[in-house]
């Protein structure tokens, strides 16, 4: 190992010369000229080898060039090539031309002729501006050989430096051989001394190993005895601590249990006392409640019996009314069957007439639809009391549309026809409004056009107001807008009042109003809705309608219906409802005894309601 360290140290000392030897591969700068051959011998004799460096500095290159035996032309060539910034192969055309000028100047300077200065800042034109034709031709000859001269100069320079380097390398190798011989002898002496030292070291290590073995055995025995003693001591301490903990836990558990038992006994005693007291209080309350309930049951026993009797009587009356309703419904079913048979016969008859007349089903359907539409619109216009224009429009448009559709001409459907009628009425109203506004603007006195309202305006004279006070009672709940008589007539007609539907006013029975009893219904079964009566003078103005057998049959069925019987029993009789109060606090719905205000249950003014 020591030999290798010495070799590395010697190599590090010679690193500078080796690096200088390989510097020519970098191609960074032109190499300086090698020193003359006369100067190499004294350098080799003294053992000093110059470093191989390539510098572009002119002074160093010239100092080396002076040491070599060169002609003035070669020296000039070396100086010119040393000033180049690039390699010979990397020169541009302009740089090559300037190199030719510099080489031509060297030739002229050696021959004593005129030179032409040319620097880096000057262009090639400025460098060759003063040349005549002969000089120009000579310059071209030199310029064509400029790259070759550059290569030759560089090779010559490298050859001189290589010779110098090889000579220095030989001198260094000789000195290294002498140093290696001395190092070899020192290594031999070192090896002998190292072997003797190793022998002595091995003997000492053997004796020391024997002593360490004896000490190890004694130490192991001592460790084993100490470990065994410590284990026994730890076990004894653990047993002692475990016993103490168990004893402490037992004592603590016994103490806690005693405290818990004492507290539980106290709590249970208090709870038992409180429960006993609460039970006594509850028993007292239950006893009082039972006494109150018993007293109330004694008081309400008669009321329950009376209510049971009332319920039985009501049930009997209900069954009787249900029997009447059942008979009425049977009669209605029989009548409907007869009516269906008649309608089928009439339809067969109409069908036969149509087949005999040769009419088509489509034309018949068109006529039926337009007739129904005409009747519906006529009723609606009459109900709304529209103007004559709307009625005339309906009277003209519906037949014309039906005739056009039967003749397969352009016709409107019912929806379009409705929109047409509505548009015409609305357009007329807008025109009247516009005319009224124009007349008002011009200052004319013109009556306002009629509004599209349901009820037409009427003048209210004192005579009519007096008649209205006589005809319409104050207890009417129907809102009056324009004409109360018309409202009553419309309501009576819509509700099916027999005074309007009948053939003559003499068939209308007189109507009596009920006494108001708290605003609640006073009968257990539904009754006819109370309506305003119409005077005989108003009935005279109603046109008589003979509906034939159908109206008579309806009147007969209505007279035999349970509603008519209820209405006759509730509205046409002079008996009022009972003024008593039932057990539930509701007014009694039974009829009062003749000449009294109470029924048989509440006779004497007593109520069946007893407060608890």
Curated annotation (Swiss-Prot):
Residues 556-574 have a biased composition (Low complexity). GO terms for cellular component: nuclear membrane. Disruption phenotype: Embryos arrest development shortly after the midblastula transition. During cleavage (2-, 64-, and 1,000-cell-stage embryos) all blastomeres of mutant embryos contain morphologically abnormal nuclei that appeared fragmented in formation of multiple micronuclei. The chain crosses the membrane at residues 364-384, 417-437. Residues 452-476, 555-574 are annotated as: Disordered. Residues 1-20 form the signal peptide. GO terms for biological process: karyomere membrane fusion; pronuclear fusion. Required for nuclear membrane fusion during karyogamy. This is Protein brambleberry. It comes from Danio rerio (Zebrafish). The gene is bmb.
